[in-house]
Amino acid sequence: MLCLTGYVFVYTSGRADNPIRSDGFSYYVYLPSWFLFHDTTLSSVARDCCGGVYPAYTAIIRWPTTRRWVNAHPIGVAVMQAPSFAVAHGLTRWTNLSPDGFTLYYQHAAGLSGLFWVIAGLMVLSRLLRRHFADPIVAATLGAILLGTNLFHYATFDSSYSHAYSFFLFAAFLDLTERWYGGPRVRTSVLLGIVAGLIALVRHPNVVFLIVFPLYGVERADLLRSRVALLWDHRRLVTIALAVAAFVIAPQLAFYYQATGRILVSSYGDLGFNFTTPRILGVLFSVQKGLFFWSPILLTSCAGLAWLLRSRHSARAFVPPALVFLVLDTYIIASWWDWQFGGSFGHRGFVDTLPIFAIGTAAFFERVSRQPVTRRVVGVIVFLVIALNLFQMLQYWNHVLPFSDTTWEQYRRVFLQWH
């Protein structure tokens, strides 16, 4: 209800334009093109909605050799939006509105779809955490992750972006990985393949998250050999998961081939990564979208993961893949040409990884809950950090905080100012 209330507030108070905007437009555009215009080339939407040429902000470009449209944003979000799109289309036809893919019902179907997947992600994450932590710890962790980071923003204000969907998929992949190692089955393998394929289909760089599966529970280097042996013993199930993932990814490769004549392309054109000069400190600590500057609550996760690494806790199995993934993911994000990821509240590149951070935060809360004085002090600090995060989120919604390239001077000038 809190997320839904936030969504309604955003779109009834004039805080945001239509949900399908900016990156959200590019992720969504496949649906009207495919199902309303029966066009897999994206040309019809360009002609009917954009005057024949997609605006530069969409990152939908003409491929130099074929002159066909190539969308930098893959089809995964559209696939996960398809059920809500079908409902919106039915309501649009029933109420005699224009079935062009961008009228009222389509707009809010796309927005509410993102909200739905965030809620679903929280439910899956809750189930995962309850296998390792007491209910009060789980409730506190989910509250901290939802309200103390930019997750609430991407569940409401910018819910048509990919991050809401990746949040769910990451939580589901963690849950399924643990269930698979608890008892490998065909059903779990199929679900792992579907989720793995969607992770790659929603945002290609997130494929690195799949490293969680082979490294789960590998707490020492000498265990790698036994892990390889285990996966080989269950090679039929691993093959099933890989085959399902390949089937899920295949439509994207077909789209690339149709548009460019290749199955693998750099859809951002000349834009890309600067792997030799990553902005790691900026990505983590700067006022320009630094992860821990804008979401200091996540420092609890760092402390919790460090404690888990030295403990015999049942959640320790997640720590090795979590640490490897977080290092790789931070390096990839910091190497992107626009390491701030454009206009956003906080660093949106890390919203996808919040299920990993949630495990560390839960461990931290469990640890401090054993000492009454420490628990009260931490509780006050967490409350204040969440309050600051929500206030700054509202500042962003009110256009008080800059969308990007925030400087210390700007931040100090508007700190705790409502308008």
Predicted regions span which residues?
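Membrane-lumen/periplasm interface segments of specific transmembrane helices
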Residues: 212, 220, 235-304, 321-335, ...
